Amino acid sequence: MGKAQKKKAMRRHNPMRVPDSHIPKGLDSAASSSQKDKVEAVLPIMQKLGSTEVAERTWACAAVSNLIQNDPGTRRLLQGKNVVGALILRLADESEEVVAEAAGALRNLCIDGGFDICAEMFNKGVMNPLKEFIPKISGRLQTVLDDPKSAPEKVQSLVYEFAENVITILWCLSETSNKALNAINSISLIPFLMAFLINRVKLPTSVVHAAAQCLYVLSEDNPPAIQSIRSESEYIACLVAISTAQQTPNDNERDMGIRVLACGTLRNISPLPATMNASSIDIDRSIALPLITPLLSYSLQDAVAEVQSTLTEPPVPLPNPSLKHAKLPKSDDKSPAEMILERIERRLRVLQLALEILTGICAQMPDPEPIEEEMVDEEDMEEMENDDEIIENGDDDAMDADEAAAPNGAPEADSSSISLLRTLIPLLLALSTPTPMSFSSPTDTTTTRISNSSSTSEAPQHPPTTSALVSVHISALECLSNLLLSFPTSDSGPVNPAVLDVAVAAWPQAWSALRTILVSTPSDLDRRNEVSVAALGALWGLARLARGVVVPAQEHVETLVQIADSPGVDEKVQVKCVGILGSLAQNVNEIEINRVIAQYLLSYIHPTPRATEPTLHALSLLIDIYADEASAYDVNFRNAHGTDILAGSVPTLRKLVRGIDKRKEGGMELRRWADEVEGNVRGFVTYRRKLKI
């Protein structure tokens, strides 16, 4: 059972990204009057981007910024007109105002467009002007820092806003491809970013936050950036100071985010150089956990209640003149309701980031059951082939009966691990539980615009909040799964009494979360499936800690079998379902449930084998479940002729094992374990045959 690692390539590159699933498609899109208005508005905007008048070019860039924010339909229309190429040209405009607005528009495109549009920007040469901006911004920033009175406040504000836009674009590009990352590495961006963090007291939090986010992303598995940070003691001291700073009453969501990002960067560059004073600090226990744990107490239910209240009773909306007659747009003109919604979303994103870092901490905890077996060579395989006849006749003495049936003892856990488990499980479960806004309706086309929804009986929807909530649920479940996996336990033998009660108590809430996810009908099925997989991982971890004690219900078994047998289901999902079932089957008071699960696990190898990894797990669990022939439910294995089925499956199992591609990622480890399972099956069959029961 593998832990969920933090995978940069798979992580959504931008926390502001809202899924496109709520956009009308096909005939619905064509029939939408608002869609027709957008088409009419796009053409004059594109024309004015190339106007000879500075005011018109500025207006057009600002209009793009406003139109595309959380509005994928308009963004796609503009993309079709090559808005990316037109805006990149405007970065070289003779007017600084046009350049600033163009950078803001490109920044918003990065945020809302995702990987594809970032790749388009990179391919169309956006790095060339961005590289030229870095020294210019550095020079102006230094001038303002040295002499704050050297420039009016409005000019300073424009410098900070422009810097934030450029940094955000670079951050998004860095996660687009290795090619883009290498291009960013070549411009030595780390000193530029660290300057904002070092001078954070004198600068707006928004630009410091952008610099911290970019630094965090660049330091993920990126040796050039890591080395650049580790080489300067001032940088490390700055990151430690930010991470350990005490929260003040005036801190907002960005202040929290900056601390969490600095902590994440410290983890990315660890271990710290031995020559530095900070090298002796245990970053996880001394910095990360004290910083992150209090953040997990944030109530999603309260946040959703505030969002719904804001959506239901918003202030009087601002006038919305036709775009064709509008004056210069101002993206900062936000209503109080919009500011509330953005504040809550930022808080959710900080929470998601904290969970991401905590997941990494749990992923790096030592595995309780390391694999130490060596690969079986060809000579051993030939010996196994010669064992088939002996196994069928039950005359093999290769495995002693006591060895075959000896259960593992309960692994020990230190008191700090137990305390951490007891503290985090309730917090993570609360963050894993779906809210009324976690999954939007398939017919919901609401965007971030505030509208009076009091006339309808349906709950108000807000896609940005929904997107953030789903991300929090996934991160919390993955973190919970890693936490449970890091706790020493085994698939057989006695369970650890120190955490048994908390695991048993957590099981109903975790199962309820999965059931809520499965019965929901969101517009974004991929995201729901992602949450479901994460929930199964957490349930597996809980089931292992409470193995044989959790009382299984028929609903549990039926649901897990249904998920595992779904058409096109991923092997990893099957593995999780099989793992949960294997733990549920070991409750000695539920003999009928055990019978149903045993028959299902045997179906993975007989009459025809299923996918390799789930089959290996099913066989391994069958051995664990029926290792003690004196158990109350052993009659189920005997009545199902389990020994004969396993004996007859040895040739099939051998083919599965040999079919594992060791060249693929994880192939070597899977082959080692598969060889172990095959050997265990052979020994188990021999042992059961000798019992003559």
Regions found by a protein language model. Name each.
Residues 30-41, 48-59, 63, 67-85, ...:
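Elongated alpha-helical scaffolds that mediate protein-protein interactions in large eukaryotic proteins
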Residues 2-35, 139-159, 287-471:
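Acidic, serine/threonine- and proline-enriched intrinsically disordered linkers and terminal tails
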Residues 114-116, 122-353, 357-373, 441:
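Fungal eukaryote-biased detector of long internal structured cores
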Residues 300-304, 308-309, 336-341, 362-363, ...:
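Eukaryotic acidic, Ser/Thr-rich intrinsically disordered low-complexity regions
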Residues 58-72, 86, 100-115, 158-179, ...:
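Alpha-helical solenoid repeat architecture
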Residues 52-53, 94-95, 138, 159, ...:
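Short inter-helical turns and helix N-cap capping residues of alpha-solenoid HEAT/ARM repeat scaffolds
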Residues 44-46, 83-89, 121, 126-137, ...:
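Buried hydrophobic core positions in alpha-solenoid tandem helical repeats
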Residues 2-5, 481, 485, 489-665, ...:
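Extended, charge-rich low-complexity regions and/or helical-solenoid scaffolds
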